[in-house]
């Protein structure tokens, strides 16, 4: 394999832009810490950290495969490996299969419940990229896909799925819809021209308000999470920091400028990180 081809594969997997992997990683860490009531098992932690990066890369590859005929018409994506011809569709499918199989081999080291849950996770990862052609709520499907690591991680750590798993699942799904709507605001004008659907288009002039409502509900549920587990003051400080980050994001998207909407999206990495830190400190 040439250096140029390897670089194209690297870019196709978004390894040069790890924001998506980080946004998937932090909620997985939340689940592991809560399930373990502290530091999770090292073998489980390693499997899920590796799995996050492998499955996020697989998701990016299948997403670009699904969008290969439209990405060339979008300013932000026209230089991606598939529309630019650096990687063929056949090569992309092959890479997706390698990444998906590698992820599954990791899951096979976990308990039977985790293995069973992984099949639904793979289905969600595969169908999400195609939803933007058929529904205005692909962000909901991304929320489900990005949250599925939560029950998987919980099951791997404890072997069971208590009700609070699904409470954390909903927290993350709502937050994901909010930040992916910010991301969709970047491409809204291009998406309207080529017929791609998104919540940014569906929400229209109410986009900022609905994002704000989703963020408020996320914060309220994070507070509820702390109350359920009787977490200390340190946790609530991190929720307050997350709230301030949401306020900053609202400031960034106020004029719906592409670059600032993208900055707001990127800022969500810090939201996930501070909540992970808060949970770790509280449960330690």
Swiss-Prot record:
Keyword Membrane: yes
Pathway given in the UniProt record: Cofactor biosynthesis; ubiquinone biosynthesis
Lineage per the UniProt record: Bacteria, Pseudomonadati, Pseudomonadota, Gammaproteobacteria, Vibrionales
Bilayer topology annotation: Multi-pass membrane protein
Catalytic activity: all-trans-octaprenyl diphosphate + 4-hydroxybenzoate = 4-hydroxy-3-(all-trans-octaprenyl)benzoate + diphosphate
Protein name (database record): 4-hydroxybenzoate octaprenyltransferase
Superkingdom to which the source organism belongs: Bacteria
Pfam families registered for this protein in UniProt: UbiA (PF01040)
Keywords linked to the UniProt accession: Cell inner membrane, Cell membrane, Magnesium, Membrane, Transferase, Transmembrane, Transmembrane helix, Ubiquinone biosynthesis
Organism: Vibrio parahaemolyticus serotype O3:K6 (strain RIMD 2210633)
Assigned protein family: Belongs to the UbiA prenyltransferase family.
């Amino acid at each position: 394999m040439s250096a140029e081809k390897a670089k194209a594969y690297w870019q196709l997997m978004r390894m040069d832009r790890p924001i998506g992997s980080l946004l998937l990683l932090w909620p997985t860490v939340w689940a592991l810490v809560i399930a373990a009531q502290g530091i999770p098992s090292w073998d489980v932690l390693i499997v899920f950290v590796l799995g996050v990066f492998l499955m996020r890369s697989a998701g990016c590859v299948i997403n670009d495969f699904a969008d290969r005929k439209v990405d060339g018409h979008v300013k932000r994506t026209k230089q991606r490996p598939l529309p630019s011809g650096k990687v063929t569709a056949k090569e992309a499918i092959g890479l997706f299969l390698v990444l998906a199989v590698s992820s599954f081999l990791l899951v096979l080291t976990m308990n039977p419940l985790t293995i069973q849950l992984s099949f639904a996770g793979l289905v969600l990862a595969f169908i999400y990229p195609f939803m933007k052609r058929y529904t205005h709520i692909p962000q909901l499907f991304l929320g489900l896909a990005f949250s599925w690591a939560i029950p998987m991680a919980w099951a791997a750590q404890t072997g069971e799925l208590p009700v609070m798993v699904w409470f954390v699942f909903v927290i993350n799904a709502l937050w994901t819809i909010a930040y992916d709507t910010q991301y969709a605001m970047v491409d809204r004008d291009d998406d309207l021209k080529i017929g791609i659907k998104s919540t940014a288009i569906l929400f229209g002039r109410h986009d900022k308000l609905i994002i704000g409502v989703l963020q408020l509900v996320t914060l309220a549920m994070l507070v509820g999470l702390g109350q359920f587990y009787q977490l200390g003051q340190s946790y609530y400080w991190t929720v307050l920091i997350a709230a301030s980050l949401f306020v900053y994001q609202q400031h960034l998207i106020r004029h719906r400028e592409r670059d600032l909407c993208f900055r707001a999206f990127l800022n969500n990495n810090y939201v996930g990180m501070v909540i992970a830190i808060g949970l770790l400190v509280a449960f330690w």
